[in-house]
């Protein structure tokens, strides 16, 4: 445990002394976060709608049997092409690079991929670099990055559905109250 703490302290001190290396790390990591945010942006409103439908059925139609559906959350099912429903490989999910290498089209059916996916990834990465540049490798910087990522997800969900999910809003509220 002691060696782990020493190693992590060395890594943190390196990034505190080398801003360019820290910004590159934040950019690459934030591209991955942006890819995950695309999943959140697409699936969280659908999960909320399913939950509302189940609650409605339980309250207004309690005598009807509940039909079990396939699991649908942020982890399952795996990502698929919205056109041909082919399950995407890990290589197809590499943030921004896979979009560019595939020319913005599905590898399997060649249907165009929405530009929103790379835009969310790139916006997340660029906003994160600005935050990291302003705050440096600090705990406050990490907090600001988390808030930035949450705001990216909330913005896109709001644009798509005019909803602001409590699953994202309430943690931000508590974070603001405790900070």
Regions found by a protein language model. Name each.
Residues 1-179:
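A membrane-topology feature that recognizes alpha-helical transmembrane segments
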């Amino acid at each position: 445990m002691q060696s782990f703490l020493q190693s992590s302290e060395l890594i943190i001190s390196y990034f505190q002394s080398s801003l360019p290396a820290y910004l590159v790390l934040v950019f690459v990591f934030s591209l991955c976060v942006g890819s995950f945010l695309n999943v959140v942006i697409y699936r969280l409103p659908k999960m909320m709608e399913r939950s509302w439908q189940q609650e409605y059925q339980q309250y207004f139609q309690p005598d009807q049997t509940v039909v079990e559906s396939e699991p649908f959350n942020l982890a399952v099912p795996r990502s698929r092409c919205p056109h041909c429903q082919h399950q995407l490989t890990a290589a197809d999910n590499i943030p921004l690079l896979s979009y560019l290498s595939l020319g913005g089209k599905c590898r399997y059916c060649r249907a165009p991929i929405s530009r929103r996916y790379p835009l969310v990834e790139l916006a997340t990465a660029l906003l994160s670099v600005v935050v990291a540049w302003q705050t440096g490798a600090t705990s406050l910087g990490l907090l600001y990055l988390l808030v930035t990522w949450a705001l990216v997800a909330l913005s896109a969900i709001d644009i798509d559905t005019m909803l602001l999910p409590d699953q994202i809003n309430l943690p931000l509220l508590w974070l603001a109250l405790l900070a």
